[in-house]
Structure formats: C-alpha cells, structure tokens
Amino acid sequence: MKKFRWLVLIVVVLACLVLWAQVINIMCDQDVQFFSGICAINKFIPW
C-alpha cells in the first residue's frame, strides 16, 4: 500500500512539472519581461 502512495505522489509531482513547463513556454511566447530570465534558463532544460 505504501508503494502505491509513493507512485501517486510521483505522478502528481511530474504532472505539476509538466504543467509548469507549459505555463513557462506560453509566457515565453508572449514575451513577458518578468519571465525573460526564466526563459533563458528554460531553453537549456530539455522539456
């Protein structure tokens, strides 16, 4: 039962990371000034 709980936790964390990556990509496309530094870093991370 504990293994199942860990699996659910990992899936939720991965889903959040994917959603966050999508949000950053959208913001980069919009060329939001605040996100310009994050976008530079984001280009080096292979999403």
Swiss-Prot record:
The compartments listed are: Cell inner membrane
The source's domain of life comes to Bacteria
Database matches in PROSITE patterns: PROKAR_LIPOPROTEIN
Q: Where are the transmembrane segments?
A: 6-26
InterPro entries in the record: MgrB
What is the topology of this protein in the membrane according to its UniProt annotation? Single-pass membrane protein
Entry coiled-coil feature ranges:
none
Main location (coarse class): membrane
Protein family per UniProt = Belongs to the MgrB family.
Kindly give the HAMAP family that the UniProt entry links to this protein.
MgrB
Known partners and oligomeric status: May form homooligomers. Probably interacts with the periplasmic domain of PhoQ.
Q: What is this protein called?
A: PhoP/PhoQ regulator MgrB
Q: Which organism is it from?
A: Escherichia fergusonii (strain ATCC 35469 / DSM 13698 / CCUG 18766 / IAM 14443 / JCM 21226 / LMG 7866 / NBRC 102419 / NCTC 12128 / CDC 0568-73)
